[in-house]
């Protein structure tokens, strides 16, 4: 087996599998205009029945996925507000739904969880590359890198604070600009 193929069949990390599961749930909920929790409950049942539509999750990954869904529902308005301020030159209607939903998921984690930013961004870029268009990974990376930088600046943290984890490989597209740190803050973001 070639090195590339060996790498392809390795299991996906628990948190990344949970993120991909939630991304699929979020995408399906948006397309069907169905409540996120209802889609999550259905997806969990489908997964438990052995259907491969959704990735199989162990108990820890499923718990993490449920936390993400709950947080996304609770903070959806604030997340969308931050994304509107961060993404310049694009409206949500102009964006691919895959890119928008990856951004929503990662923005929730960046703002409301203690997760280090680089692994969250890296997972988001991987999901965008897997499910999105040719430029999705680069676009998502650019938006999230700017958002991460702004969030760290808001709490007075040095941009070098996240250097313990590898930085994403792509750079921001020309039409993406970081949010204005002086703009109003979303409700209850995490303290870093």
Swiss-Prot record:
The lineage of its organism: Bacteria, Thermotogati, Deinococcota, Deinococci, Deinococcales. Belongs to the NusB family. InterPro entries: NusB-like_sf (IPR035926), NusB_fam (IPR011605), NusB_RsmB_TIM44 (IPR006027). This is Transcription antitermination protein NusB. Transmembrane segments: none annotated. Residues 154-192 are annotated as: Disordered. GO terms for cellular component: cytosol. Pfam families: NusB. SUPFAM superfamilies: NusB-like (SSF48013). GO terms for biological process: DNA-templated transcription termination; transcription antitermination.
């Amino acid at each position: 087996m070639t090195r590339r193929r060996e790498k392809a069949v390795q299991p996906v990390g628990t948190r990344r599998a949970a993120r991909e599961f939630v991304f699929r749930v979020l995408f399906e909920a948006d397309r069907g205009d169905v409540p996120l929790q209802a889609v999550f409950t259905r997806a969990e049942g489908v997964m438990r029945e052995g259907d491969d539509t959704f990735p199989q999750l162990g108990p820890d990954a499923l718990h993490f996925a449920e936390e993400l869904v709950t947080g996304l529902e609770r903070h959806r308005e604030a997340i969308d507000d931050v994304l509107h301020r961060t993404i310049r030159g694009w409206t949500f209607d102009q964006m691919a739904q895959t890119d928008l939903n990856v951004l929503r998921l990662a923005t929730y984690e960046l703002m409301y969880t203690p997760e280090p930013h680089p692994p969250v961004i890296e997972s988001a870029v991987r999901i965008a590359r897997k499910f999105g268009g040719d430029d999705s990974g680069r676009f998502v990376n650019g938006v999230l890198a700017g958002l991460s930088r702004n969030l760290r600046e808001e709490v007075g943290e040095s941009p070098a604070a996240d250097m313990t984890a590898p930085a994403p490989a792509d750079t921001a597209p020309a039409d993406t600009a970081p949010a204005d740190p002086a703009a109003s803050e979303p409700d209850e973001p995490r303290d870093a």
